[in-house]
Amino acid sequence: MTEQGTSIIQEFDQTPAKVFEAVIDVRGWWSKNITGSTAAPADEFVYDVPDVHHSRIRLVDVVPSQRVVWRVLDNTFSFVQDQAEWTDTEIRFEISAGADGRTVLRFTHVGLVPEFECYDVCHKSWGFYVGHSLRKLITTGTGLPNEITDDVEVIGARMESVAG
């Protein structure tokens, strides 16, 4: 697999342990409509926005306070031709010590490249979920995940309100 992908790097005053706990609390920052487990190696979960996006993801590497790696096992989007664009990509959260005792979180969706039809939407979405919602969960204890009943219009409006 190519090492290319979309990345977001953030720094926090919180400890690596606190950043790690927020990352594995996927319902706290991505979507409350996650089924399955999201914390230990070999856990699998499903992310679903009905009629728009469905992903089944496995945790393939989990090292507390250091890293979490997901592998996308299967994925479908309603808005692209090639339904395999996310399949077999890796989503990495790498936690390390930064300057002045700060914690660095590097998020990379390895394999999500500009050539993909979904790239613009997915890049923007990760910017919201990781750059805003996960950041908020880490810094305040409350993220901005999708609600179980949210449809794509509600989700889009939430993203736009933060971006605007």
Language-model-detected regions and their locations in the chain:
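Short, intrinsically disordered, mixed-charge
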Residues: 21-29, 64, 128-132, 136-140
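Hydrophobic ligand-binding cavity/cleft-lining segments
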Residues: 1-38, 163-164
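Beta-strand/loop substructures that line and gate deep hydrophobic ligand-binding cavities in soluble
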Residues: 79-128, 145-147
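Glycine-rich portal/gate segments that line the openings of hydrophobic small-molecule binding cavities
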Residues: 28-82, 163
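Hydrophobic/aromatic beta-strand elements that line small-molecule binding cavities or substrate pockets
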Residues: 9-10, 55-61, 88-97
